[in-house]
Amino acid sequence: MSSTLIVQLDMRTLCQEADVTADCVIEIVEHGIVEPSGRTPEDWLFDDQAPLLTRRAAKLHQELELEWEGVALALELLQEVQQLRSENSMLRQRLGRFTQM
C-alpha cells in the first residue's frame, strides 16, 4: 500500500526555512512568485517548493537589486530553460536509440 505525503508550511515556518521576513514573503506572493492556499497571510499554507523559490526570489531581489517584477520574470525564464533542457535531454536519448542501430 502506498501513501502520498503532502507537506504544507505556514508563514512562520516558510520564513524560517527560507531565512526571509514575513514582509518579504508578502511581496513575493503579491507578485505571483509563490502561490499559497488561504485568504490572509495568517491562513496561508505553502507547498514544499516554496522555501526554494522564496530563497531564490529574495536573493535575486537583494543581490542583483532587481525589482519584484524582474524577479518574477527571471524565475519564470529559469524554469523554462530547465524544462527545455530536460526535454532536450529526453529527445537526445530517443534519437540515440535510432542512431545506434
Curated annotation (Swiss-Prot):
Family per record: Belongs to the CbpM family.
Gene field: cbpM
Role according to the record: Interacts with CbpA and inhibits both the DnaJ-like co-chaperone activity and the DNA binding activity of CbpA. Together with CbpA, modulates the activity of the DnaK chaperone system. Does not inhibit the co-chaperone activity of DnaJ.
Stored InterPro entries: CbpM
Highest taxon of source: Bacteria
Record lineage: Bacteria, Pseudomonadati, Pseudomonadota, Gammaproteobacteria, Pseudomonadales
Name used for this protein in its record: Chaperone modulatory protein CbpM
Cysteine disulfide partners in this protein: none
Pfam families reported in the protein's UniProt record: MerR_2
